[in-house]
A protein has these predicted regions:
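Major-groove DNA-recognition helix of helix-turn-helix-type DNA-binding domains
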Residues: 18-46
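Short, structured secondary-structure boundary patches
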Residues: 45-46, 57-59
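Polyanion-binding surface elements
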Residues: 2-24, 51-58
Length: 59
């Protein structure tokens, strides 16, 4: 992960990019079929945008 070019996106943007709902995204994460989120706070997560984009292309 290159910190200079890494953009973090929140779940609503991931849902918009993938067309999937929150429950389905969490199911894919739990099954190891989706990029893992990063904790950015005690109750907040984000995803690395480049990982999501790569996942979309490969899906």
């Amino acid at each position: 992960m290159n910190n200079q070019n890494t953009r973090l996106i929140r779940l609503p943007e991931v849902m918009n990019k993938t067309g999937y709902g929150k429950a389905w995204i969490y199911r894919l994460i739990n099954e190891g079929l989706f990029p893992k989120p990063i904790k950015i706070g005690t109750r907040a997560i984000a995803f690395i945008e480049s990982e999501i984009d790569e996942w979309i292309v490969s899906a």
